[in-house]
Amino acid sequence: MRHTILLSIVVIAAFTGCGGQTTRTTTPPKAKTMNCTLDICGDKKIQNPTESDIRQAVFALDTKKVDAFLILGPTDMTYIQTGGDQNVGFKLEYQETDTKHHYRANRDLTADEIVKALVAYSTGADESKTMAEWDLVRW
């Protein structure tokens, strides 16, 4: 009888945590980092750019001096790209796998918005796609 009671207590404790309240929390998953290359005006490429690299590249763009564009992506057919500068604003486009899936933001964005979009894209976050409404580009 004593063994049965002891076994019952052990079983109850195992399932209820000895009567103490337990709180379960889940850690949000870390954003996955894509293997991306940042192409700066066709002159310089940075493999897996940091947020600092992206910010510096965006704020350095100047349409009066050179072709001012950035392309960030894992392949030649999957990428996000921008053109412009702080004075004229920035266009933003992205493409997924082929030219049938090429989209352009329907408004100009600020330099800070471009940094946010490119950083989000580089980590695999969908935030870059929710910053604007997108129009399908028909070639």
Question: Across the structure, where does each feature detected by a protein language model lie?
Answer:
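Positively charged n-region of N-terminal signal peptides that target proteins for export
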Residues: 1-4
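Hydrophobic helical h-region of N-terminal Sec-dependent signal peptides
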Residues: 6-12
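C-terminal motif of bacterial Sec signal peptides marking the signal peptidase cleavage site
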Residues: 14-17
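Bacterial signal peptide processing site
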Residues: 19-21
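Negatively charged, low-complexity tracts enriched in Asp/Glu with abundant Ser/Thr
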Residues: 27-73
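Short glycine-rich, low-complexity/disordered patches
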Residues: 63-77, 126-139
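Intrinsically disordered, low-complexity regulatory segments enriched in Ser/Thr/Pro
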Residues: 79-109
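Mixed-charge, Lys/Arg-enriched low-complexity segments
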Residues: 104-139
